[in-house]
Each structure stands twice: as C-alpha cells, then as structure tokens.
C-alpha cells in the first residue's frame, strides 16, 4: 500500500513539474532569453510604387509577431530584429489567349528581409521572399489592388514568420 501511494505521489509530482507546450504556429522561441523584437518599417525600393503597400505590409508583419508570440514590440534594441525593403512590385501577363491577349495578370510583391537574433546569431537570415496573386485582365488594377495587397502581405508575413521564428 505504501509503495502504491508513493508511486502515485511520484507520478503526480512528475506530471505537475513537467509541462509540454505546443503551438500550432510552430514558433520556436526561448522566452527565457528572448523577450523583445524590433521590426523596422520596410520602405518601398521597387521601380513601380503603390504607396499603401508599405503601410499594409508593415502592419501585417508586426501583427504576425505580436499575435503569434509573446514577444514585446520595441522601437530599437530588440532581442530579435527584422529590417529590409520592398524590392519588387510587378505586373506580368499570364494565361495568354490565342489572340495574344492575356486573360490573367499577376501582381507579384518581393521583399528582402534581414533578420538578426542577438541571442543566437546562427539563426540570422538575409533572404528574399515573394508572393503573388492573379486577377482577371478584364478587371482594373485599381479595383482589385487593395484586396490583392492585403492577401499578398499576409502571405509574405506568414513566410517571413515561419522562416525566422516558425522553425519550419
């Protein structure tokens, strides 16, 4: 009886002492050492410029880190730092028909990202990310641009998050 009670108490102590945390976003951050992140605004350095892109992208990227992690966003000196620029904003014809007209147009946004992990420099990253959306050529870009930029910015933020702290 004493051995049985001792075994139960030992299991109870082990279960309460050990915790397993799994996040479906895949974030692999050691919150004991990494507490802050600095995300500098990404300016547009592309030949073709759509001014609302910078604001939409910057806010979406910051939201990705603040909503999916416990990191505090700071203006400078973060344990993690993200910076870069929007290097491409391109429209290309897709799905050319037999009469040599494109039935689809592709909007592609390219971003160069520099990621610095001051606690673990082996995680540092300097990489380019791209995302695109196709839309019917019969639509005016001005009619679909804002929605496409929102979707592309979200995809880019997810790609960057996964490449930096997502451990994917």
Model feature map: region roles:
Residues 30-31, 74-80:
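Short, glycine-/polar-rich solvent-exposed loops and beta-turns at beta-strand/coil boundaries
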Residues 43-50, 139-147:
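Second-shell loop/turn segments in exported
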